[in-house]
C-alpha cells in the first residue's frame, strides 16, 4: 500500500498549525495572507467531503502583541492573561475568513481534564461529533486562561500533544502537524552531514526515540521528542500522523495528494502492512550487520556506523530499521 492509497482513505482529519506557521517571525503579528490560504485549503477539503478539525496555536502570542508586551510573559498569570485576550482575537480572524465561504466554525477550548475525566471526555466527544454532523469546523486550543500544571490533571503543555489527544478522542483517521521543521531526520542535519530524512515510520521504538530526544541533541530540544510522543498517541489510536513544514501551507494539498511531504508515522494497522513489505530487506540488512560485528580489527560501534552509511542500503539506526527512507 503506497502513501496515496493510505491518504485517499482519510475522512476525519485533524490539522494542527503552530504559532510560527500563522505569524510573522519578525513581528509576532498574524500572517493574514498565510492564514487566508490555510482557510481556503480547509474549505476545499470540506468541499471534498472531508471532516476537518483545526488545532490552532497563537493565542498567547496574539494577546501579547495586543497588550503591548515586548517579551514573552514570564509569569503564569501574565501568560493566562495573554491567552485570554489573544484567543478571542484569533477566533475573530478565523470566523471572518471562514465566513467568506459561508462556513460555520466553533471554538472548542479544552483542558487536560476534558480528556482524562471520563464524564468530561464523553461530553467532549459528543460535542465534536455533533459539530461535525452539522458541518461545522471546530477550532481547538488549550484553555490556557485556566489550565494549570497541577497534580490532579495537569495541562497538555503543547499543542502537538493536544492535537494527538484530540485525534484519539474523535477517532480521527489522520493528524497533520504543520510546524517549523520539514520532518524527522536520523540526526540533526545542521551538524551531521550523514543525517538522513525519514519519509515513513512504521514503528516507534527506542532507537527512533533516541534520535528525537538524546540528552545532548539540539534536534531533540527543538521539540521533535514532543512530536514523536504525539505520534505514539495518535498511531496507537488508529490515526496516521504527518509532520510537515508550515512555511509552505500548500504542503497540505501535496500531503493529501499522496506526495512524499514530511514524515509519515503509520498507525499500527498500516504499520504492520508496511512491516511485511520491508521484512526481506530488513532481514538482509541485519544479517550483514551481524556478520560485520564478527569480523576482526574494528570496534562494533565503528563497524556498524560504517555499514549504516553505505548508500546501497539507505540505512540508518544501529538496528538497521531505516530502509529506503522508511523506519
Please state what every model-predicted region is.
Residues 1-72, 76-104, 108-327:
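C-terminal catalytic "cap/lid" subdomain
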